[in-house]
């Protein structure tokens, strides 16, 4: 029995013939009659660079789907404009020399030539692209663009045209991502273009990372995939790279200079979702930290340096002197941008570890006596005065972030032929250390000056006879005596609040009825009294009564 007869009996010859015809029919059933394969080569560096990449080689290959032959090609080198000198790494990788790009036209000229080449294909072969396929004749040959990944048309060309204010041709806004199609069809992730060809038994021909050679090999891969039964379709119609502009405004938590912090409640569930670093200082009787708090949550603190100028309304707290973080704005926590910013000044006299964005609040019900040295109070007052005059500047040259997360919008990762690109290392030039300015959200308003001196305060507390503000009286009185909230008409202890509406009384402290106005079952007694009035009564009692009687009354 001859070999030919045995093959006929086994049906090998018929099977081959049927398989070949089936493959041709499956290829011809594709939606597109022509495919244009594009594979750009761009400027690249060994290390990462902040500058964008520019196209230096613009190849295109026209593939006939039915015949599987390459019928036309377009190729041109492109002269880079932003960084015209190629790196040694780029020349070694792509094989493109400096002389080739110097004598090449810029990108806008190459795009014009490429558009003329596309028009010639439309006239000669009746090629129709997706942009004008709606009004095309029934006999028109539909054509699509194919790239190995979304990087060529979705990242490289798009970003460069935006930087140079060039318009992308409408036909190049729709393409087929062959790598994504390969992964879905064969259910495996390819290891680059060469690896995808080797997995299918096709040898990569030519020099790798040469634009025209890569386009030809990509055409071979597309033809093989269609032969295996893969139906090519547009993977990213009118897809744009999601370019998110860097916010040039203040973060949401730092937009208003005088922020109204409302409904600050003393509950344990308030700060469970905050991203800020909270330091719990428990059972400490005297806290004298020079770090000015990393947004500190102080529990059971008997003595803490606290400003009374914080913008608060409806502060709800218990008598345990628990400190809560004033980071609730309209009932929601804005902890994303409450980063602690450190003062980077090269000063040997002032040692400030960090400056808090929000000041720590201590329960205002009880003001305990404090025995501090005059030097410590002056140092702390100078530090807080420096913090209150600064504002947040997102364009500052060298911000110093500490104990916070700097959220940066990152571009969706894409590949440039599976090669890590970057910038060449540059020589480090010595420069003077930058001086960072710390920022603060809240600015302490100027103190309200009284019309005349308070001589009783001068004699009793040892102060100089000069016009003093209400805050100065409060601070002086807090160092000597305990001040108890007055009783309202309801018979309850009045609540101590601070005006935060930015008006003429901004920063002043007052007392009101502790009952909520929103409660319909109970009615408030409309009790209201400025703290300055309470202090005046207390000071007058200090001068008219004996020290023992005044001390008994204040308690």
Curated annotation (Swiss-Prot):
ZnF endpoints (GRF-type): 488-534
Cofactor: Mg(2+)
Polar residues: bias regions: 290-299
Cofactor note: Binds 2 magnesium ions per subunit.
Binding residue positions for AMP: 41, 209
Residue positions binding Mg(2+) 2: 39, 152
Residues of the Exonuclease domain: 35-222
Record Gene3D superfamilies: Ribonuclease H-like superfamily/Ribonuclease H
Active site: 41, 209
Keywords: Exonuclease, Hydrolase, Magnesium, Metal-binding, Nuclease, Zinc, Zinc-finger
EC number: 3.1.-.-
Residues where Mg(2+) 1 binds: 39, 41, 214
Binding, Zn(2+): 488, 490, 513, 525
Record-linked InterPro entries: 3-5_Exoribonuclease, ERI-1_3'hExo-like, Exonuclease_RNaseT/DNA_pol3, RNaseH-like_sf, RNaseH_sf, Znf_GRF
Single annotated GO MF: zinc ion binding
Keyword Glycoprotein applies: no
Start and end residues of each stretch annotated as Disordered: 266-319
Family that this chain belongs to: Belongs to the ERI2 family.
PANTHER family named in the record: 3'-5' EXONUCLEASE ERI1-RELATED (PTHR23044), 3'-5' EXORIBONUCLEASE 1-RELATED (PTHR23044:SF61)
Protein name: ERI1 exoribonuclease 2
């Amino acid at each position: 029995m001859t070999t030919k007869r045995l093959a006929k009996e086994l049906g090998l010859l018929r099977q081959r013939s049927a398989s070949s015809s089936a493959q041709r029919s499956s290829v011809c059933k594709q939606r597109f009659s022509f495919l244009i394969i594009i594979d750009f080569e761009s400027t690249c560096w060994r290390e990462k660079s902040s500058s964008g990449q520019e196209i230096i080689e613009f190849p295109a290959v026209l593939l006939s789907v039915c015949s599987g032959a390459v019928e036309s090609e377009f190729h041109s080198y492109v002269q880079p404009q932003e960084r015209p000198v190629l790196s040694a790494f780029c020349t070694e990788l792509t094989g493109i020399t400096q002389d080739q790009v110097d004598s090449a036209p810029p990108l806008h000229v190459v795009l014009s030539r490429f558009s003329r080449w596309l028009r010639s294909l439309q006239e000669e072969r009746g090629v129709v692209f997706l942009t004008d396929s709606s009004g095309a004749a029934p006999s028109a040959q539909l054509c699509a663009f194919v790239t190995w990944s979304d990087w060529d048309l979705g990242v490289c060309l798009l970003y460069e045209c935006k930087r140079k204010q060039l318009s992308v041709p409408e036909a190049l806004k729709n393409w087929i991502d062959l790598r994504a199609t390969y992964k879905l069809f064969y259910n495996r992730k390819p290891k680059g273009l060469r690896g995808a060809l080797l997995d299918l038994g096709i040898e990569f021909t030519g020099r790798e990372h040469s634009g025209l050679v890569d386009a030809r090999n990509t055409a071979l891969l597309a033809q093989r995939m269609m032969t295996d039964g893969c139906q090519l379709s547009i993977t990213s119609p009118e897809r744009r790279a999601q370019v998110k502009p860097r916010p040039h405004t203040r973060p949401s938590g730092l937009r208003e200079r005088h922020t109204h912090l409302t409904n600050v409640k003393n509950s344990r569930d308030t700060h469970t979702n905050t991203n800020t670093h909270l330091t719990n200082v428990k059972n400490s009787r005297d806290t004298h930290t020079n770090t000015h708090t990393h947004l500190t949550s102080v529990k059971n603190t008997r003595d803490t340096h606290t400003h009374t100028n914080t913008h608060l309304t409806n502060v709800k707290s218990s008598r345990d002197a628990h400190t809560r973080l004033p980071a609730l704005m309209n009932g929601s926590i804005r902890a994303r941008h409450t980063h602690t910013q450190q003062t980077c000044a090269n000063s040997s006299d002032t040692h400030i570890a960090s400056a808090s964005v929000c000041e720590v609040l201590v329960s205002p019900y009880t003001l305990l006596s404090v025995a501090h040295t005059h030097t410590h109070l002056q140092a702390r007052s100078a530090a807080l005065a420096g913090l209150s005059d600064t504002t947040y500047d997102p364009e500052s040259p060298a911000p110093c972030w500490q104990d916070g997360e700097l959220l940066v919008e990152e571009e969706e990762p894409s590949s440039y032929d599976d090669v890590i690109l970057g910038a060449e290392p540059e020589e480090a030039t010595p420069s003077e250390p930058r001086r960072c300015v710390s920022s603060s959200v809240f600015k302490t308003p100027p103190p309200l000056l009284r019309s005349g001196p308070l001589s009783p305060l001068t004699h009793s507390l040892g102060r100089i006879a000069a016009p003093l503000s209400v805050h100065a009286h409060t601070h002086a009185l807090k160092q000597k005596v305990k001040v108890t909230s007055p009783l309202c008409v309801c018979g309850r202890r009045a609540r101590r609040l601070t005006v935060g509406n930015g008006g003429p009384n901004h920063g002043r402290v007052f007392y009101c009825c502790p009952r909520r106005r929103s409660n319909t079952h109970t009615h408030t007694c409309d009790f209201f009294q400025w703290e300055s009035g309470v202090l005046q009564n207390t000071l007058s009692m200090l001068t008219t009564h004996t020290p023992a009687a005044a001390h008994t009354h204040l308690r």
